[in-house]
């Protein structure tokens, strides 16, 4: 009996060490047979006491993990789990769209995984997103700038536990709201490499898809985008331009003419799927909906056998939600314009790929083109189509600051609408080839 406290302490040490160091996942419920790639999951503690525990999924490159680039993938939201990227956009697995029957939903292999040519860390952030959690009540409200520092610390600690990847070329990547986080993170890493942190992270650049960049610009370009896509009439477009004077979403309440015209605009567009105007605005609980796998994800990941397989800490969170901050957790959006970070990163010489699904109404490609133009870098390669098997997959332009802009034809707010095309675009760019 006297040895019981020592055994308990030893057990706690083993559990904490096991969680923090990462665990290999060889099988996943819903997938037949062993996984055809190397998956590791785990937590990295943040802060002096490491009370914040950030959860990650790490997948090794299927080609040459010792030399291939190391990517960090952040999903948007803020507060959406990175498994959104893994299972819906650029990972090696996807949920099979089959009517839910009470059993664990099925997983299938994909042909468009970015892990074919890169090692990828899919990180659940901020605190409370996915399986990331805090052991103690938070004193400060999570924020953009706070998460940038947390993610930087995560990377330093993760690489210290995985030193074999320290020399791999590193790229930060993400989409949607990550457009606020990734550019600031790149700047933070760059500064840290010179000031505080050894060994330095081998930072080479960043990748962003349909990035939220400057709320006012992103929103205001929805009007010209809607006109160009024939969603509103010429007459409404000319009237709204004249009476709103380019400010469509933060309208002076005294400007009644503009308010009425904006109301007419919403009548024409509110029933659309704003994430891809070509896709139906459907109920995700319906098996006929393109996004039905999102509904299945909740059943899959909340199944106890799945959480056990992923080595999720049982005392961490209750029911998993794909996006948390939009619903119930306070968050301080203290970066309202990430353009200055892009400018600083350009000056530092980092490569960047900025891509836009050209049927996204949330962050229209026109808005992204506008802020890129505001950087005032000269054009190296003029606007041209990029091709896949003699077919136009989108259009691209490159700039003197090592920035490549590309559209993905027919795609929407995220890569899931055209995953094969987005993968080929990524594969060419990350290899240093022209699109």
Swiss-Prot record:
GO BP annotations, alphabetical order: proteolysis
Pfam families: Peptidase_S10
Molecular functions (GO terms): serine-type carboxypeptidase activity
GO cellular component entries: extracellular region
Residues forming the catalytic site: 176, 360, 413
Keyword Glycosyltransferase: no
Glycosylated sites: 101, 313, 336, 344, 376, 420
Localization per Swiss-Prot or TrEMBL: Secreted
Enzyme Commission numbers on file: 3.4.16.-
Signal sequence region: 1-21
Annotated keywords: Carboxypeptidase, Disulfide bond, Glycoprotein, Hydrolase, Protease, Secreted, Signal
Tissues expressing the protein: Expressed in roots.
Disulfide feature: 80-323, 244-258, 282-289
Record-stated family: Belongs to the peptidase S10 family.
Function: Probable carboxypeptidase.
Protein name: Serine carboxypeptidase-like 12
Taxonomic lineage from the root: Eukaryota, Viridiplantae, Streptophyta, Embryophyta, Tracheophyta
């Amino acid at each position: 009996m006297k040895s019981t406290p020592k055994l308990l302490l030893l057990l706690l040490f083993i559990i904490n060490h096991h969680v923090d160091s990462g665990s290999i996942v060889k099988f996943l419920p819903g997938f037949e047979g062993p996984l055809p790639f190397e998956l590791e999951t785990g937590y990295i503690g943040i802060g002096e006491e490491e009370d914040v525990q950030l959860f990650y999924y790490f997948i090794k490159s299927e080609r040459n993990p010792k030399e291939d680039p190391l990517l960090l993938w952040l999903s948007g939201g803020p507060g959406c789990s990175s498994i959104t990227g893994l299972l819906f956009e650029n990972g090696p697995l996807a949920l099979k769209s089959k009517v839910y029957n009470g059993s664990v939903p099925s997983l299938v292999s994909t042909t468009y995984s970015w892990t074919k040519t890169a090692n990828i860390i899919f990180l659940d952030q901020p605190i409370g997103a996915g399986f990331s959690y805090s052991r103690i009540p938070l004193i400060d409200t999570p924020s953009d700038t706070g998460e940038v520092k947390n993610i930087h610390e995560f990377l330093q600690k993760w690489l210290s536990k995985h030193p074999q990847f320290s020399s791999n070329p590193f790229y930060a990547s993400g989409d949607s709201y990550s457009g606020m986080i990734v550019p600031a993170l790149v700047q933070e890493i760059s500064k840290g490499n010179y000031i505080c942190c050894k060994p330095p992270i081998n930072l080479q650049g960043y990748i962003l898809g349909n990035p939220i960049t400057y709320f006012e610009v992103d929103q205001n370009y929805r009007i010209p985008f809607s006109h160009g896509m024939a969603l509103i009439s010429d007459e409404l477009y000319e009237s709204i331009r004249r009476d709103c004077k380019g400010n469509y979403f933060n309208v002076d309440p005294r400007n009644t003419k503009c308010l009425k015209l904006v109301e007419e605009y919403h009548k024409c567009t509110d029933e659309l799927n704003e994430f891809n105007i070509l896709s139906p605005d459907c109920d995700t609980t319906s098996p006929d909906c393109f996004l039905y796998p999102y509904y299945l994800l909740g059943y899959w990941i909340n199944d106890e056998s799945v959480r056990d397989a992923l080595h999720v800490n049982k005392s961490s969170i209750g029911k998993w939600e794909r996006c948390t901050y939009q619903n119930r957790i306070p968050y301080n959006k203290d970066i309202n314009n990430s353009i200055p970070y892009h400018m600083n990163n350009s000056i530092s010489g980092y490569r960047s790929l900025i891509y836009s699904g050209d049927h996204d109404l949330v962050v229209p490609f026109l808005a992204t083109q506008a802020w890129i133009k505001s950087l005032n870098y000269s054009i190296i390669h003029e606007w041209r189509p990029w091709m896949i098997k003699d077919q136009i997959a989108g259009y691209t332009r490159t700039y003197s600051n090592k920035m490549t802009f590309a559209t993905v034809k027919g795609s929407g707010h995220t890569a899931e609408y055209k995953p094969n095309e987005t993968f080929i675009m990524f594969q060419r760019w990350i290899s240093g080839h022209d699109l």
